Amino acid sequence: MRIVYLLIPFFLLFLQGAAGTATQCRIRGGFCRVGSCRFPHIAIGKCATFISCCGRAYEVDALNSVRTSPWLLAPGNNPH
């Protein structure tokens, strides 16, 4: 029975998780959520044992950075 008192601190230490991961999640632009992430967010990491770091599946700026050439948009201006 004495060993139970010695194992309890190790068990609590195991459940605590790594310190600072919630801060790292926020730095990456995410937020912590208990359980799984809901649409339109995806899991980008872990905040703790049962807590996911959720973020957007895509960024709007990444979609806006795609450039299209004007000759692709204008009919009859194909150089080939």
UniProtKB/Swiss-Prot annotation:
Keyword Magnesium applies: no
Annotated signal peptide: 1-20
Alphabetized UniProt keyword annotations: Antibiotic, Antimicrobial, Defensin, Disulfide bond, Secreted, Signal
Tissue-by-tissue expression: Strongly expressed in the tongue, bone marrow, bursa of Fabricius and trachea. Also expressed in skin, esophagus and air sacs. Weak expression in the large intestine, kidney and ovary. Expressed in the vagina and ovarian stroma, but not in the ovarian follicle.
Disulfide bond among keywords: yes
Induction: Expression in cultured vaginal cells is increased by LPS and S.enteritidis.
Disulfide bonds: C25-C53, C32-C47, C37-C54
GO CC terms of this entry: extracellular space
One Pfam assignment: Defensin_beta
Annotated localization: Secreted; Cytoplasmic granule
Main location: secreted
Chain positions listed as propeptide in the UniProt record: 21-22
InterPro entries in alphabetical order: Defensin_beta-like
Entry's Gene Ontology molecular function annotations: CCR6 chemokine receptor binding; chemoattractant activity
One Gene Ontology term from the biological process aspect of the record: cell chemotaxis
Function: Has bactericidal activity.
PANTHER family assigned: BETA-DEFENSIN, GALLINACIN-1-RELATED
Family as reported in the entry's similarity comment: Belongs to the beta-defensin family.
Name of the protein this chain belongs to: Gallinacin-3
Organism annotation: Gallus gallus
